Amino acid sequence: MKILKKDSHEKFYWLGFLAGDGSVQEQGRRLRIELKNDSLDILNHFKDFMESNANITSRINNNGCHCSKIDINSKELGNYLAEYNIVPNKTKTFEIPEDKIPEEYKMDFIRGFMDADGCIHIRKERNNTPSLSFVSGSKKCIEQIKDILNITNKINQQGNNYLLYKEGKEVITILDKIYEHSTEETRLKRKYDIYCTIIK
């Protein structure tokens, strides 16, 4: 599995994505990713990256959404992900392991997390102002993202989640950094398309 091998922009993108949308189950023996079908492309990219023969299956979840999922069964993978705090029931406790992420790969990790638990938007009611937000059940995680991206806005609590929101021209500068080393395989197309619209 490439994720267990040497450091790369691709590897840390996927670690960031798994920090958001990865679910470690069966006492660390299984990794599951389940996404709405509009994100099916990213599941296929992940499967290719992992060099996995696992099947991607479809279902309708309890909310009536059409979803696709992939399960990868590997205790070795589970142990490795635990080194990056990607463990069972991480929603409220996850912390970005900054000491394990070289500076040159931090934006890749953030991009992965953004594709999982972030949002890029164009506020048409505000003269097409770009906005960027991150949400997590872990306040510490959002505080770390705030510091890494040097965002001065305060963090807001919404129910059980914490929200970091930024809008305005500075969003373009932030996204430029986040997407600097991205490739077609390491970015969610629908979010990247919004970024491309913003910078036109």
Write out the residue ranges for each language-model feature.
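Internal intein/HINT superfamily modules and their associated LAGLIDADG
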Residues: 1-200
